[in-house]
Amino acid sequence: MSVFEIKHPLVQHKISLMRAKDMSTRSFRQLSAEVGSLLTYEATKDLELENFQMEGWDGEITGQRLVGKKATVVPILRAGIGMLDGVLELMPSAKISVVGLYRDEETLEPVTYFEKLAGDIDQRLALIIDPMLATGGSMNATIDILKKAGCNDIRALVLVAAPEGIEKVKSAHPDVDIYTASIDDHLNESGYIIPGLGDAGDKIFGTK
């Protein structure tokens, strides 16, 4: 397992803006998509290409195109939806698989209430998207669902991650790489990431 903390200046600038207490829903939503797009760029750097011949404006040229596994984007509902448009900007043909989870506020454990996966997910690269990797419970539950469906090429894209969540995913799924804009300090007693972003779902959907 590898953890990639993306230190690109644009990523760091945008994730810092998202931490502001007075961030509007519109701005938070837009930045979630933008950082999601930048994380997708980093997470797909190793996709396989092949050469092919094509007609250019001045005759035949050699181009390159993607080959190998196609992708499916897996937003964890509901907050993962906030990153989806940004991912699809770069991968508009990707199928969308959906996993719905909520965190039990007493046990902090994930509860699955919905899942709808691409029919051929066992043949696809899965990009799980969720703004927060906090305790790691929701991420592990989603990975479990994907693996049960036969998908074994999985990457996780999160805006911010807590060290505790990273370790939990690493322990359960050492084959899954994580891409994040920031590895934050710790979880508080309520299971929220510090300094974190607050409740990303509420901020994206305007229900805070």
UniProtKB/Swiss-Prot annotation:
Organism, scientific name: Colwellia psychrerythraea (strain 34H / ATCC BAA-681)
MF (Gene Ontology): GTP binding; magnesium ion binding; uracil phosphoribosyltransferase activity
Enzyme Commission number: 2.4.2.9
Binding site for 5-phospho-alpha-D-ribose 1-diphosphate: 78, 103, 130-138, 199
CDD domains: PRTases_typeI
Co-factor(s): Mg(2+)
Pfam families the UniProt entry points to: UPRTase
Cofactor, how bound (note): Binds 1 Mg(2+) ion per subunit. The magnesium is bound as Mg-PRPP.
GO biological process: UMP salvage; uracil salvage
Name of protein: Uracil phosphoribosyltransferase
Keyword check for Magnesium: yes
Reactions this protein catalyses: UMP + diphosphate = 5-phospho-alpha-D-ribose 1-diphosphate + uracil
Record has Mitochondrion as a keyword: no
Signal peptide annotation: none
Pathway: Pyrimidine metabolism; UMP biosynthesis via salvage pathway; UMP from uracil: step 1/1
Role played: Catalyzes the conversion of uracil and 5-phospho-alpha-D-ribose 1-diphosphate (PRPP) to UMP and diphosphate.
